[in-house]
Amino acid sequence: MVAAFFDVDGTLTATNVLMPLAWFMKANLPKWRYLLWLGKLVCHIPAYLVADRFDRRVFVKMFFRQYEGIDAERAKVWHQENFEAFFKSRIYADAVKQIQWHREQGHKIVLVTGGVDFVVKPLADWTGADLIAGRLEEMDGKFTGRLIGEPLIGDGKAKAVLAYADEHKIDLTKSYAYGDSKSDVPMLACVGNPVAVNPDRRLRQIAIKRGWKIVQWR
């Protein structure tokens, strides 16, 4: 069986890891509390930028601490109910066309993201895709802000793809992978048909050097 593995933020959608949390907080907090939270978040941005440059896995772990204390069920239900309002309009039209092409070929569609599962699950349901995503630890009905396991970034994302391929009898030499950043390189290198989508500078350089396909999706 052939599969198409898609990164989400920046590849399928014009989103980043911060946006879903910001949407949720704005919709569920009184205005003064939201502004207070936003101010604290802004204070963390320099540290996040340094961490992201050093190791994106470190950044992801740091950022997900922002979920600490949030009611888990409320967050899951809100993201499911508000998919159309906040997320659907940010899906690239070209990405939808490509997913449809893969479906017509009989390929299995798989979303692979360093984001958390309940945020991306509505997108996976809408596209009819399997989902490989991070999970947040829960305690007494609230998120602790800690990931279960290692972030699905870099080699972690590639390992998840290899495990999925082994379980589902996927022929990786004939399969496809789509990503937008250097951290997606290990996943892209797993398949016979890697595609750099709206690539950042470092991924573009690697894609050109390795002869990978480069596309711009809107």
Task: Please give the residue ranges for each predicted region.
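Small-residue-rich anion-binding loops in enzyme active sites
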Residues: 47-62, 127
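Catalytic cores of large soluble enzymes that bind and process phosphate-bearing ligands
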Residues: 13, 67, 153
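C-terminal cap/substrate-recognition subdomain and adjoining C-terminal extension
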Residues: 1, 77, 84-218
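Conserved active-site and cofactor/substrate-binding residues in soluble primary-metabolism enzymes
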Residues: 16, 70, 156
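Amphipathic alpha-helical interaction elements
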Residues: 51, 64-67, 195-196
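Metal-dependent phosphoesterase signature
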Residues: 58-94
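Active-site neighborhood of HAD-like aspartate-dependent phosphohydrolases
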Residues: 1-51
